[in-house]
């Protein structure tokens, strides 16, 4: 691990184009920033030739993702399917250099009535259909992942129903491509980040996104505050201001300092991109985000839902009759192997009070 202060120094150098001396713990720095999907940006900070490979690799990934985005646009326009690009495909355009904002996958929203047609035309174009979640379907092509959304969240009615009708907030770009209005886009990004924190956790990258988003002089902070109140995320919005203020300095809007900021920042650094770095304990994040007994949580974690079981044991997708056998395998693994999940849950008990303090203050305990 590296300290909060060192992380802050590196991030400040990234956004303000400063060059730092290569530290003695450069291997630790590289590992942390790999976990955060930010390692490619270290080359501009240290100008160390050993880091150039990450920088060059990022440009290749960016071009490949660009090609996929252009292909998706063509496919949906040719088949008269309305669509909205989500998340990183939009956010990267506000970065000084677009390729600096990498994406784990490409997210696209279509109208619910078009989901079957969209699936069909993608498969016809060589996209391999994967797992179907409640709100999106996964596709893969050329080792890249696309998520085809028909809803923005698994439960569209959460966040007080704010995201039930996203197309009412859509503005036409050209042909069949649409985009969200600015406020709705920001609200979606805030709620999406909150979802990750209530799940396995989230890392630094979204806060860099918000730093660039909120540094636009046209941002209507009063409107953002009012909309955040509507979805119950006013405290979480305030916490975002605190974090980008800590890392980069931020004076575009007044915000209330939070008591557990250092713990909050440490959790973010430990989490990695989506809570699965070696130093992260996503069970502590999950347990902190829910007001339920440890016993109930322990049972839920060790005996996952049917949906999660299918991810852990892919053969269930093809042979659902083997579900009882998969349950037996899971129970035996927990009892006799002392699995990674068990170890993480035990460690979570030590971390939980710190996490609860943070989650209470940022408004994500439910």
Label every PLM stretch briefly:
Residues 1-104, 110-366:
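Conserved NTP-donor binding/palm subdomain of two-metal-ion nucleotidyltransferases/polymerases, i.e.
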């Amino acid at each position: 691990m590296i300290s909060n202060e060192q992380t802050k120094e590196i991030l400040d150098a990234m956004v303000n184009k400063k060059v730092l001396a290569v530290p003695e713990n450069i291997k630790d720095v590289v590992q942390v920033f790999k976990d955060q999907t930010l390692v490619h940006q270290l080359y501009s900070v240290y100008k160390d030739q050993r880091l150039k490979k990450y920088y060059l690799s990022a440009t290749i990934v960016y071009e490949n993702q660009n090609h996929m985005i252009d292909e998706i646009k063509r496919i949906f326009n040719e088949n008269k399917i309305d669509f909205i690009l989500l998340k990183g495909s939009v956010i990267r355009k506000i970065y000084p250099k677009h390729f600096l904002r990498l994406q784990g996958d490409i997210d696209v929203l279509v109208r619910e009535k078009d989901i079957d047609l969209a699936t069909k035309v993608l498969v016809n174009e060589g996209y391999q259909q994967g797992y179907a979640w409640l709100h999106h379907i996964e596709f893969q092509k050329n080792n890249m992942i696309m998520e085809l959304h028909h809803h923005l969240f698994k439960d569209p009615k959460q966040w007080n129903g704010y995201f039930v009708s996203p197309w009412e907030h859509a503005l036409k770009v050209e042909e069949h491509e649409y985009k969200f209005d600015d406020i709705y886009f920001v609200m979606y990004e805030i709620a999406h980040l909150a979802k990750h924190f209530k799940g396995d956790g989230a890392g630094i990258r979204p806060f860099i996104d918000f730093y660039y988003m909120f540094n636009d002089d046209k941002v209507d902070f009063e409107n953002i505050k009012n909309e955040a109140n509507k979805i119950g995320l006013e405290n979480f919005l305030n916490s975002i201001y605190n974090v980008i203020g800590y890392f980069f300095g931020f004076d575009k809007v007044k915000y209330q300092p939070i008591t557990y900021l250092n713990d909050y920042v440490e959790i973010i650094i430990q989490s990695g991109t989506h809570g699965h770095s070696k130093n992260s304990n996503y069970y502590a994040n999950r347990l902190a985000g829910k007001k339920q007994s440890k016993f109930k949580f322990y049972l839920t974690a060790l005996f996952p839902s049917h949906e999660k079981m299918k991810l852990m044991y892919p053969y269930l997708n093809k042979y659902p009759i083997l579900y009882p056998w998969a349950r037996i395998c899971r129970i035996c693994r927990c009892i006799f192997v002392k699995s990674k999940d068990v170890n993480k849950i035990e460690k979570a008990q030590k971390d939980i009070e710190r996490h609860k303090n943070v989650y209470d203050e940022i408004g994500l305990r439910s």
